[in-house]
Amino acid sequence: MNKILFLIPAYSFKKLLKHIDLKLLRSYWIGFALSLTTLTSVAQNKVFTGGASYYAKSFEGRKTANGELYSNYDMTCASRTLRFHTFLKVTNLKNKLVTIVRVNDRGPYAKNRIIDLTEQAARIIGSYKHGITKVKLEIVQPPENTDSLEKYFMQEQVIDAEGKVVNPTGYTISIWRTRDFDHALLLTKYLQQEEYIQSFYVGKKYQNGRPLYHILVLNISTQEEAVKLKDFWERKGFMRVRMLEKF
């Protein structure tokens, strides 16, 4: 099975954040491609507030406006006007919980709503089964040169962001998976900026001949610890967390 992994070390992020203005942050790891721009909006007029709803379970498998098949387990959304493949940082203004979603559908058309979220995204921000939730939306840009980055990592089976070969050991937790490489990078970057003690990897496998990108926590020493981490991420709202003996 072909696969690739890379790591964005938490300690490196913390050092950078202490010394660099986040609004100007544009750091390139060992010159080969990963542009780490901050997840703030790119312009003042690209911040929106309004009501968020979520899709009913019955939409599973239906075609979205851009031709994809809708999945309750993905982190996509419907917007009336934003371009397809726009990435949005969604913040629940009541509890400040955040996730990153991608526009792939049109709607909602009710006046009091500006976005429809998947069940997965709604669970993560704590809005599932809470009706219309007031949210802030910020357009965020994926890292630059991701095509070059993906090709670079295809040269090695397992690699970290400093260009070193990684040999994972122990148990692995797959938090979430997506077909979209940019989406995996953005969500990994957001998680790494949080106060979690884990380091996050993006792993690539092929499923039915197409790449599938997993956000991973690696090198978990015991099954007991892995079970606890799986439970932790499920309580965070992730619906398909998997514990693996090896990725």
Question: Where are these predicted regions, by residue range?
Answer:
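Secreted/periplasmic proteins
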Residues: 42-172, 177-186, 190, 231, ...
